[in-house]
Amino acid sequence: MSHFRCLLFTLASLIVAAQAALAQPRFDFDTSPGHLPKTVVPERYALSLTLDPEATQFTGQALLSLRVRESVAAITLHASKLTARRAYLGRRLLAVTTDEINQTWTLTPTDGQPIAPGAHLLSLDYDGQVGSTGSGLFQAPYPLSGKTVRMLATQLEAIFARSVFPSFDEPAFRTVFELTVRAPIGYEVLSNMNLSSSVDDGPMRIHHFAPTPPMPAYLVAVAVGQFDALAAHAAGVPLRVLSAPGKRDQGAYALAALQQLLPYFNDYFGLPYALPKLDLLAVPSNRRGAMEDWGLISFAERALLVDPATSGTEKRRRVFDIVAHEVAHQWFGNLVTAASWQEIWLNEAFATWLASKASDHFNPEWQLPLRQRQDLEGALARDAGAATRAIRSGPVLEDRVFDVFDDITYAKGGAVLTMLERWIGPDNFRRGLAQYMQDRQFSNATAGDLWFHFGKASGHDVGSVAATWTDQPGFPLVEVSSRCEDGQTRVELGQRRFTTSGHAAPALWQIPIVLSHDGIVRTVLLDQATQTLLLPGCPAQPTLLNPAGDGFYRVAYAPAQKASLAAAYAKLPAAAQVTLLSDSFALAQAGSLPMSDYLDLLTALPKVQGPGRSALVAQAGTGLNFLALALAATPAQAPLLVAARALLAPELDAVGWLPHAGESSETESLRSALIVLLAKFDDPTTVAQALAHFDADEAGRQPLPAAIRSAVIEATGRHADAPRFEQLSARLLKAQGEQDLWLYARALSSNRDPALARRVLALSLRSELPNNVAPWLPGMVGEQPAHAAMAYSFVAEHWAELAERAGDMFGSRAWLLPSASHSFNDLAAAQRLRADQQRLAGAPGAAPAARVTAQIELQSQVRERESERLIKALEATARLLRSRL
C-alpha cells in the first residue's frame, strides 16, 4: 500500500474519531432533534375516542396536562387531517391555526396574553378520518359468513399519531396516556393496558383503560372489532393471541413462541416485562408488517397466524422471528426509546439482533447461524453501491422518515452489534446492556448512552470503534495473505472500502475480525490500514476470516490462499463455505475477481456433505438470480439456465419431491427452495412435476402437502397455461387469509405469458383485493425481465390510483415505480426511473429511486462486462456438472 493511501486512511480515521466524539453525546431532552419546541412538555394525556368500525370518521376529546417551561405566546403541537371543534387552555379560549404542510396546530389564546410558565390543562375537541391503507386509525375489512365486516386498528409509527389525536408526536416526548373508547355494543375494544371499567350508554359502551407508563405517542394502540382469542400465561403475565373470528387455532404457534420468548427476554435483560399483559393481534387485509405497540403488538395476519395444514418450516421460521423481533421491542424501543428518528437503529438493530439470538436458542434444528450471511446479503449489496447511507445519517426529514426503516438500520445495525459482542465478549456485552436498560428505562437514549455502558462494562473504547460503523456509509474489504515463517503463520491484513459502484471516498474502519486458525477461533481488532499477525503453527488449511459469516465485511484472499481454499472447499466448515461463496460472487460482481472463479466454486457444491446444504443452495440462488437479471436478453441467458439446471436438478432428485417421516427441517427447506429455483430456470422435469401435483390438488385427488404447497403453487403460477391461470385466479379471489392471498398473487404475477401478465396488472385496480396486496401486483409482474417494461408503463399510467391504495405506511407510494424496475439491466431504464419518479413522487421518492437505480446500474455493468465472455465458462460449468452425474 502506498504512503499516500496510508495517509488517506489515517486522515479518514482521525476525522471519524473526531466526529464520533462530537456526534454521539448522551441523551439530553433539550438538545434532542425534533421539530417541536421544548418549551411546552406534555405530562399526562386523557384521550377519549368515539369509534365505530363501520364508520369512516371518528370524534375525539383530548385533555393534556402540560408543563410550560417558559412564557410562550402559543402552543404548537402535531395534528394532521384533524378538524378542531373546540380548544381551551383552562378557561381561556384558543384560536387554532392549521398547517397541513408541517402537520401542526398552533394554539393561541384569544385574549392576546402570553401563556405563563407552570402547569396547564389543554382541552381539545376534534373530528378525524378513518383510513384504509394501514396507517393512523384504519379499517381492516374481512369476510365473515358471506358478508364483509370490519375491525379498526392503529399504526402510529412513525408520524401517524397526529392523525388520530393532537399530540407531541416525536419520540423524545414521553407521556402517560389514559384512554377511553366509546364503541357500539357488540364490539370488543383493545388497547395497550388492561380494561379498568366499562359502562353502557344506550347503544354504545364506554371502555376505560388503565394509564400507561410514560411513552411516546407513536406507541399508543387501539383496536375495535370482534375477536377470537387464545390465552396463556408466562412469567406471571397474561398472554393472548387475537384474530378475526374463525382463525383462533391459527394463533397457537405464535402463542407457544410468546410463552418461550417472554421469560427468555426477562432473564436476558434482568428486567421483567413492564406491563400487566401482552396481546398479539392479527389484523386482516390493510395491515402491513408488524408494530411493537406496548402491550398490544399488531401484525399482518401472514406475519402471525400459522395454519398447520398449509404452512411449512419456512413459514414457522418467519413467524417466530417476527414475533421475537416485536417482543424484543418491548425493551428496545418501548422501555427505552430512541431519542429521535435518526437514532431509530437503536430500536430496530437491537430487535433484529436479539430476535436472531432467541430464534436460534429455541430452534437449533433450523441451523440459523448458517443463514446469517444470506440474511445480510441485501444490506451488503446496498451498502456497496452508490445509494447507501450511514446507520446514523443525520437529521431525518419527516416526509422521508421511512427512508431510515431499511436494511441498513435493521440488518447492518444488527451485524454491527454482533461484531461488538464478539469483540468485547458476550458477558461484558450483556452486562453493559443491562446497565444501559437500567439507566435509561422509561426514558430515551442515544448511541452515546449505549457506548458509555458497553465501555464501562468492558474497559474498551467502544464508542470510537462503533462510530466507524454507524457514522460513515459503506463497509470494508479485508485483504489477507499468509505464509509460513519459522514455524509460525505470518498473516498480512489490509482494508479498503468495498464498492460495486466503482467510486467511493476512502474510509477506515476499526474491524473486530474473527479468524479461524488451526481450529482455534479468535477475535482481533484491525484498526489500521494494514496490520500483521503472527499465529502459532503452519496448518495445511489457510487461516479463515469471518468463518461464521456474521461480520459485516467482505474478505479477499491472496491467490495462493484462494486456490487452497477452493481445493479444500468441500471440507470447510459449513458457514465458511457459505461465506466464501458469498464473497466470491460479490467480488466477481464488482469486477475484482473473474466470474469464472465463482462458477468454479459452484461446481464444488455437489461434493459438499453434511449440514448446510439449504444455506448453500440459497446462497447459490442469490448469485444465479442476479445473473439471470443481468444477463436477460443476452447470448449468455440460455447457457446460464442450462448451468443452473445442471447444478440444482440433481439436488432435487436426491431429496425427492415428497417429505419423508422424520426428515429434518433443513431438508424440507432445501426441497422447497430447489422447486422454486428450478421452475424459475425452466427445468422441464420440475415444471411437469409441479403442474402434476397442482392438477391433482385441484381435482381433489391428492391435497398438496404443507411442506411443498407454496413451492408447487409458485412453480405452477410461473408456467400456468390459461386454464390453470383461471384456477389460480379463482383461488386468489376466494382466499380466506393473507398467507394465501400473497401466495396466489406471487404465483400469478410470475406467469411467463404476456397476455396473462396484463390480466394480473388489471387486477391491481380491482376492489376485490385488499390495499395491502393490490398495488404491489405490478411490482411482482415486473420481477420478470420480459414483463418489466409492461409493468413499469402500467404503474406510470395508473400511479395516482395505485398510490391512493398504497398509502403512506413504510413510504409505500414512493416505492410503486421502483418496485416495478428491479429487473431492468440497461442504463436508459435507470435514467428513465429517476425522471419519472421525480415527476410522480417528488422529493420523498428520491431515496427509493436511488436504491433501485444503483441496482439497475450494477446489472448493466455486469451485462456489459460478462454477457459475451461468460458464455464459454457457463457451457463448461454445465458440462462439468453433468459429467459428475
Task: Label the model's feature ranges.
Residues L63-K81, F177-P184, G494, F498-I513:
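Surface-exposed beta-strand/loop patches in extracellular or lumenal glycoproteins
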Residues L376-G378, A384, H503-P506, S516-L525, ...:
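Long, ordered, helix-rich scaffold segments
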Residues A84-L89, V462-G463, P473-N546:
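Beta-strand-rich binding/interaction modules
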Residues A21-T59, S145-M151, P171, G463:
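N-terminal, polar/Ser/Thr-rich
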Residues S2-H3, M151, F209, P238-R496, ...:
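Hydrophobic alpha-helical and helix-loop surface patches within well-folded domains
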Residues L8-A17:
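Bacterial N-terminal signal peptides
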Residues A79-L144, D201-G202, T530-C538:
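A surface-exposed beta-strand-loop module
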Residues L36, D125-F227, Q250-Y253, G394, ...:
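Extended, low-hydrophobicity, Ser/Thr/Pro/Gly-biased non-transmembrane segments
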